[in-house]
Amino acid sequence: MMNAVSRAYVRGGAQVLSTGLKASGVAVNSMANRQAHTDLQVPDFSAYRRESVKDSRRRNDTAEERKAFSYLMVGAGAVGGAYAAKGLVNTFIGSMSASAEVLAMAKIEIKLSDIPEGKSVTFKWRGKPLFIRHRTAAEIETERNVPTSTLRDPEADDQRVIKPEWLVVIGVCTHLGCVPIANAGDWGGYYCPCHGSHYDASGRIRKGPAPLNLEVPTHEFPNEGLLVVG
């Protein structure tokens, strides 16, 4: 009897197991539905491609032309960059250059052989006119013999020159700052047309409203034919 019961239990278990497997098989089949789309189109960019590169199997006949264009663009960019760099470098160097105040203190070198005897030449120095006069022997003699007692601003001629033949003065009238005219006036030196001041060939005031002689700047003669002012 026990054998019959055992066989019945086994058959029941097999039926349950078989039923479970069938149910599980139905569940698996229900989850395996395909969700993929088969009507998608592969993107085609042929309309945007140049004719020369549409066929990848064909030899590219325009490669050299396109390379030349690329080289041209790179070269143009390099030239533009060089000009931009040049501007930046010039600006940087300009910011490091001497200021106007420093330049105003600069010296000036004058070649004396360019000034003939008896002539007065004007240069620009520190923003002002500079008179360089190559005096004649007669002018030197005349100015040396002037009594200082007769002068408004007493000063002997040898106090105003380093070399007798060269007079170096700033060409600004000591009255109101006008620029005198060379080789003019009652004393043949300088004449200020603004208010009528007369200076002699030593730059000393002789007549008119100017209170002082023309200023003599610092200068030297490093050699026989060169004058350095400043």
From Swiss-Prot:
Residues 134-228 form the Rieske domain. The keyword Lipid metabolism does not apply. The chain crosses the membrane at residues 68-85. SUPFAM superfamilies: ISP domain (SSF50022), ISP transmembrane anchor (SSF81502). GO terms for cellular component: mitochondrial inner membrane; mitochondrion; respiratory chain complex III. It catalyses: a quinol + 2 Fe(III)-[cytochrome c](out) = a quinone + 2 Fe(II)-[cytochrome c](out) + 2 H(+)(out). Binds 1 [2Fe-2S] cluster per subunit. Its EC number is 7.1.1.8. Residues 1-35 form a transit peptide. GO terms for molecular function: 2 iron, 2 sulfur cluster binding; metal ion binding; oxidoreductase activity; ubiquinol-cytochrome-c reductase activity. It is a single-pass membrane protein. The keyword Transit peptide applies. Residues 86-230 are mitochondrial intermembrane. Keywords: 2Fe-2S, Disulfide bond, Electron transport, Iron, Iron-sulfur, Membrane, Metal-binding, Mitochondrion, Mitochondrion inner membrane, Oxidoreductase, Respiratory chain, Transit peptide, Translocase, Transmembrane, Transmembrane helix, Transport. Residues 36-67 are mitochondrial matrix. Disulfide bonds join C178-C194. The Rieske protein is a high potential 2Fe-2S protein. Interacts with sloth1; the interaction is probably involved in the assembly and stability of the mitochondrial ubiquinol-cytochrome c reductase complex. Belongs to the Rieske iron-sulfur protein family. This is Cytochrome b-c1 complex subunit Rieske, mitochondrial. It comes from Drosophila melanogaster.
